[in-house]
């Protein structure tokens, strides 16, 4: 008996094999595989599987993070601290912009904005009351442990 493919598996396979520039393009590719879905649902699935939009030869495209990318982020983040309204992430020199881009893509519904220098990122949450939860989301996305 053939195993039924889930939409998560189909989406991961599309991203692995061909990628996509837009969520609408992903909707069309999923529809071609028999999954009728909406852009907002695709957006949620992309967050769930931690897909990010990366620049490449064919322009910016959605992609799955590799296991080495997750391992790399763990070694690039030196600390994550916060006050009542702002999260500050210290990184090794030269990596703040790359990590800020991961945060912007992976947590765009929780983050109002990021500002990255060479080794420091300021993260402003959409809702200050949810700042502790955002700290956990950031730690999970970057595969780091909080102090």
From Swiss-Prot:
Subcellular location(s) per record: Cytoplasm
Coiled-coil spans in chain: none
Pathways per UniProt: Amino-acid biosynthesis; L-arginine biosynthesis [regulation]
Cellular component, GO annotation: cytoplasm
Domain of life: Bacteria
Entry GO MF terms: arginine binding; DNA binding; DNA-binding transcription factor activity
GO biological process: L-arginine biosynthetic process; negative regulation of DNA-templated transcription; protein complex oligomerization; regulation of arginine biosynthetic process
Keywords: Amino-acid biosynthesis, Arginine biosynthesis, Cytoplasm, DNA-binding, Repressor, Transcription, Transcription regulation
PANTHER family reported in the protein's UniProt record: ARGININE REPRESSOR (PTHR34471:SF1)
Entry function: Regulates arginine biosynthesis genes.
Family: Belongs to the ArgR family.
Identification of the protein by name: Arginine repressor
Lineage: Bacteria, Pseudomonadati, Chlamydiota, Chlamydiia, Chlamydiales
């Amino acid at each position: 008996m053939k195993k039924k493919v889930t939409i998560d598996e189909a989406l991961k396979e599309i991203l692995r094999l061909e990628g996509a520039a837009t969520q609408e393009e992903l909707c069309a590719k999923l529809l071609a595989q028999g999954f009728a879905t909406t852009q907002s649902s695709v957006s949620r699935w992309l967050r769930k599987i931690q897909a990010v939009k990366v620049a490449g030869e064919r322009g910016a495209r959605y992609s799955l993070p590799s296991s080495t990318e997750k391992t790399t982020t763990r070694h690039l983040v030196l600390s994550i601290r916060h006050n009542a309204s702002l999260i500050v992430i210290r990184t090794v020199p030269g990596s703040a912009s790359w990590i800020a881009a991961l945060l912007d893509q992976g947590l765009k519904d929780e983050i109002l904005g990021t500002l990255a220098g060479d080794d420091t990122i300021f993260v402003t949450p959409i809702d200050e009351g949810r700042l502790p939860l955002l700290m956990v989301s950031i730690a999970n996305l970057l595969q780091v442990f909080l102090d």
